[in-house]
Amino acid sequence: VSASNREILIDPLVSLDKDPVVGLRAAATAAQLGLPLSLDSFTSLAEKLKKGEGALTNPWPREARELLIALIGAGESMVDIFETLDQEEIIFQWIPEWMSVRSLPQRNALHRHTVDRHMVETAVHAAKLTRKVQRPDLLLFAALFHDIGKGAQEDHSERGVRLIEPIARRIGFDSKEIEIVKNLILHHLLLSSTATRRDLDDPATIQSVLTAIPDVNTLELLHALSIADGEATGSAGWSDWKATLVNDLVHRVKRAMAGAEVAPQPEVSDEQSALALKGQLRVSVQEHSSGLAVEVISPDKPGLLSIVAGVLNISRLDVKSARTKTIGSS
């Protein structure tokens, strides 16, 4: 592999059977240096691979796996390289399962890219977060394949777990690493959906994440994957508000993993109790970085929470969580 005229070349005399990782080496080098691949070199590589030359062993040599991770972790410059590998049908020689998501349209209108391009973009965003996790290689690998289960009439996360195991094993990850990757793919929507749809003050909310995620390292990997996935989806699927909620959820789960009480319910203050016992309506609003906290003290009645939520909805305010407390008999 060499650079000439600001592009990466593969020696035409190289034997793929003697050096089967040369294609991955060239792709990773190009991505890391931000240089394009020589089209002639990769057309020739594709033809040789289709003839059965240079087939990688199962499992892959360690160098091949490391080069794949280097390619995935190169950031924005890997997009064009991966596109070339796709157009020349080289990626399918290494990872045949990629064919099932090639140019696959999304069912969710929030997405701005096809399934395959979205996964590539997720890897680009994940590359920015590798210093925040203990196993950047597992983060990058999971990012590139987190939606591999799409394209069938079943839950794509569950199908993705079945598909990723043979891929990860073939690429050379060990059983423990594969279990982590499977967990990330199965639960890649968990943090976002939990943070935005459930009350973070409810102990059951925190417990649901604790049940799914076994340790802090996996939680941090899942957090980074959630951010990368959201950012790759676009502004319609990710925002500062959602990021704040996810961060809050992760912080609470980490505290629980460290042995802290799970989401303790705050006590009602003496002032709040006194106001409630007066039986008069009072509404107060406090502004926080993540939104508004609206406190409503009112005589109880059937449907009170729905009435309050309806008023907020009419005012074009989204209710992200709610907590109620009844004092006395009314």
What are these regions (language model features)?
Residues 1-109:
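Non-catalytic interface/linker regions that flank or bridge core catalytic/transmembrane domains
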Residues 2-8, 87-148:
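Active-site-adjacent "gating/activation" loops or surface patches in catalytic cores
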Residues 16, 58-61, 71, 75, ...:
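Conserved phosphate/pyrophosphate-binding and hydrolysis machinery centered on Walker-type P-loop NTPases
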Residues 38-45, 60-65, 79-88, 94-101, ...:
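Short coil/turn segments at secondary-structure boundaries
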Residues 2-7, 42-49, 59-65, 97-105, ...:
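Short acidic (Asp/Glu) and glycine-rich catalytic loops that position anionic groups and cofactors
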Residues 1-8, 80, 203-330:
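Regulatory modules associated with amino-acid/nitrogen control
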Residues 114, 129-255:
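Divalent metal-dependent catalytic cores for phosphoryl transfer on phosphate-bearing substrates
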Residues 17-28, 62-69, 79-83, 88, ...:
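Non-catalytic, well-ordered alpha-helical scaffold segments
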